[in-house]
Amino acid sequence: LFSEYDYCLNIGGFANVSFDNEQGKRIAYDLCPANYVLNRLMRTKGHDYDKDGETARSGQVNRELFDALNALEYYHREPPKSLAQEWVDRNVMPLVEACKDEFANVIATLTEHSAYQIARNFRPGARVLVTGGGAYNVYMLERAKAYADIEFIHPARNIIDFKEALIFAFLGLRRVLNQPNCLASVT
């Protein structure tokens, strides 16, 4: 599925990527926390999410927090690798809670962090299919493009919103057909 793109990026609670490596092997792994942290913080202000990244756009990046987030050990490990809410609670939230900056600046910094971590995983000139709720975060995608020469392609809204359901149906079909439906190289 979606083989016409260099990478498939899903920006949900966590940003994750899948692609075929140089040997033609399918690789998939988590890049970084995304909407899980942003939405959690936005809810403290009565919003479900940062619509179009407007709150982030209104803030300034806190370099100390940005650098601390990017220094986390997970980002220096080779794939396959996977994230979980517990990892965020143990590693990210203490940094966020220790930052006494303005709310918009914290959101700007978390968005910048996600954008940076997303961008650093793509080769220059890549065509990237982007799905998940974060596909609607215009500002995050703008910031990712500032770090790398990448083209984000937005599919039809039903693909953005329901890709995971479609994938699980596809995996079920492969099972019914006695075809492999999981790969060791995918987390």
Per-segment meaning from a language model:
Residues 146-167:
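Conserved phosphate-binding/catalytic loops in two-lobed NTP-binding clefts
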Residues 15-20, 39-40:
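Short beta-strand scaffold segments in enzyme catalytic cores
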Residues 1-6:
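Conserved phosphate-binding catalytic cores of ATP/NTP-utilizing and phosphoryl-transfer enzymes
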Residues 126-144:
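Glycine-rich phosphate-binding loops at beta-strand->alpha-helix junctions
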Residues 8-10, 31, 131, 155-162:
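Active-site nucleophile and cofactor-binding loops and adjacent substrate-binding regions
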Residues 115-123:
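A short, acidic, amphipathic alpha-helical segment used as a generic capping/interface helix at domain edges
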Residues 24-115, 175-181, 187:
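Conserved ATP-utilizing enzyme core subdomain
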